[in-house]
Amino acid sequence: MKNIQSLIFTLSTVCSLVALSPSVMADAAAGRAVYDGSGACGACHGALGKGDGPAAAALDPKPRSFSDGVFKYDTDGDGIAGTDTDLFNVIKYGSAAYGGAATMPGRADIPDSDLQSIVAYIRTLKN
């Protein structure tokens, strides 16, 4: 029993360190800069990702709130919706490419590395 407790403690510590690693936090910080800047994500999704940006009132359907951490698209057919790959694909190609609304445009003009950083930032917005 003591070995199992030690294993669980070790695994949870490692997971915590990975989740808070400087590279992940740097990616999220870079993602926020793009989200707020050239990505213009906040115009629809809001500064805190709650779907309440200044342009949101004019959109139907309303922009997704990132605070609940629930995403509906399985863009790569792996049977799991809302993975980092799924978020990346929806941001890059737009939700209409996956049967969603055209109100979420694709942003293929943004470099892939910046799109990955935006995904990292969006993950930090979950309550």
Report each predicted region and the residues it spans.
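Detector for the c-type heme attachment site
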Residues: 44-51, 92-96, 106-109, 123-124
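Solvent-exposed helix-loop boundary motif
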Residues: 56-70, 74-76, 88-93
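Bacterial N-terminal signal peptides that target proteins for export
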Residues: 1-12
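Sequence/structural segment immediately N-terminal to covalent heme-attachment motifs in c-type
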Residues: 27-47, 56, 63
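Short sequence/structural segments immediately N-terminal
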Residues: 28, 34-38, 98-101, 125-127
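Axial heme c-ligation environment in periplasmic c-type cytochrome domains
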Residues: 74-115
